[in-house]
Amino acid sequence: MQEVNQLINSENVYSNIKKDNFGKMLLDKINSYGESDYSYYWTYSHIGFDKYEEGLAILAKGKVCDVEDFYCTSHQDIHSISSRKILKVTLEINNQTIEFYSCHMNLPTCEDENIRENLYNLVNHTDDSNLKIFMGDFNTDYFNQKKDYNMIIEMGLFDTYEMAQKKDDGVTVYKNISGWED
């Protein structure tokens, strides 16, 4: 999950997780249905709107082998919106080690960061042969930013939307949101 925020001033519940952390609230709801096999991991990249710790989360079910967060950007300051962390959770599933990465990349128009370099840092974070699944928001519009979209594909990544046998129209956000203003 991306943009899993919590208010800076909220009460700490455990580790770096606060009472109003959406992922924690989701896990609590899942647990209320009698599920208890999920683990929750969260980290944040930067402060948003002067009041939120803006972060990434992964809910994992199964044997967790490793958890790591790292910056893919040259900016690594929580006070810079250009700072982007990646959350990686490694699971063992059916005797196979699989790395899951929750990503929220900068917009291609970000002038403070080299998007190609950020993607390179992400894709080449580990050199092992484990299956890697990159999930999240790459902030690239397939319809209007073909060059940027193709750059992602040229890095060796597969777009699961393109691989799907059944598809909708491919648009998840139909109007401008914060950061997309003209």
Predicted regions and their residues:
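Soluble non-cytosolic domains of exported or imported proteins
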Residues: 16-20, 113
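Active-site regions of metal-assisted phosphoester/phosphodiester hydrolases
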Residues: 24, 28-31, 37-182
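Active-site neighborhood of divalent metal-dependent phosphoester/pyrophosphate hydrolases
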Residues: 1-17, 160, 164
